[in-house]
Amino acid sequence: MKFIDEARIEVIAGDGGDGSASMRREKFVPFGGPDGGDGGRGGNVYAIADRNINTLIDYRYAKKHLARNGENGRGSDCYGKGGDDVTLRMPVGTVVTDMDTGELIADLTEHGQQVMLAQGGAGGLGNLHFKSSTNRAPRQKTDGKPGERRMLRLELKVLADVGLLGMPNAGKSTFISSVSNAKPKIADYPFTTLAPNLGVVRVGPSKSFVIADIPGLIEGAAEGAGLGHQFLRHLQRTGVLLHLVDLAPFDENVDPVAEARAIVGELRKYDEALYEKPRWLVLNKLDMVPEDEREARVADFLARFEWDGPVFEISALTGQGCEALCYAIYDYLAEHSDAHRAAEEEDLATDVRFRDAPPADGGATPGDDA
């Protein structure tokens, strides 16, 4: 199936039905009074996150989604039927934004999460509501309210723990296929990967994390070179980025340091917050470097790149160093997940302490002796 990560749609909620202005007309019941029922409410439009869907392709071609109108009220106190709701199933990770106001309407991060996109109009009132001691036969009734109408932008940001960065042919697809069950297309030409790929890396019976491979970046991607940097949005939810560098390029004129700096520059142009994410340097294709040259080549790269963060030396093709890298990633994610959970618990405990704290001025509380 074709991978689509962006779409624009129009959602139209149903209009409310009109109220009825009817009088009770029945044998042996003179002056029966008003019996007009209310109109039904208009149908709502909802979005629900579904983990079994992984693309927005359904919304690339189906642009308009309408809910049904509510039925009009009728006599004999008959209320109109409410309009049927419409539920749009979207991939987990979809962000829904109002195109006219820029308002963030929904960020679907959990399976089954449901959000209202457009609310149906309220039904009108029948003349039954306007009866009074001075107006026994009212003819007033109200019309139903129109439903909401919105133009929405849908963006899919895949949910992954780890994101892969690198130039085309840096070995990202080979790496993800080596450490997970993902089967991306792998070839010896640039831009083999045209859409994000996800793989689950298992380091134990109940220990795993998700890794995302996106199409490669090149210098000038911010200006649209190559495939641009549109796929970088899929890395915004990750906990750590792996910057893969080809340490043994086939072209002797290619400088790995210059390519690595170009990737960092494009990352910063796209999003400062993404640039500030934890980033690990992964030097790949060491199997192509003679053993007696490896240490010197790695040291030269790190000195010129001026890198003082975590460094891992691997060969995605042979698997050398990949297992140690995966265990380090899992330990890092587990540690920071525990730290984040502890911080949330501390915030909650602090909030409880403040709620239960005595008055700051030391004044008497109700019930204290004067």
UniProtKB/Swiss-Prot annotation:
It is an enzyme of class 3 (hydrolase). One of its GO terms (cellular component) is cytoplasm. It holds the Pfam family MMR_HSR1. One of its GO terms (molecular function) is GTPase activity. Residues 344-370 are annotated as: Disordered. The keyword Cytoplasm applies. Its cofactor is Mg(2+). It comes from the Bacteria. It is found in: Cytoplasm. GO terms for biological process: ribosome biogenesis. Mg(2+) binds at residues 173, 193. Monomer. Belongs to the TRAFAC class OBG-HflX-like GTPase superfamily. OBG GTPase family. This is GTPase Obg. It comes from Burkholderia ambifaria (strain ATCC BAA-244 / DSM 16087 / CCUG 44356 / LMG 19182 / AMMD) (Burkholderia cepacia (strain AMMD)).
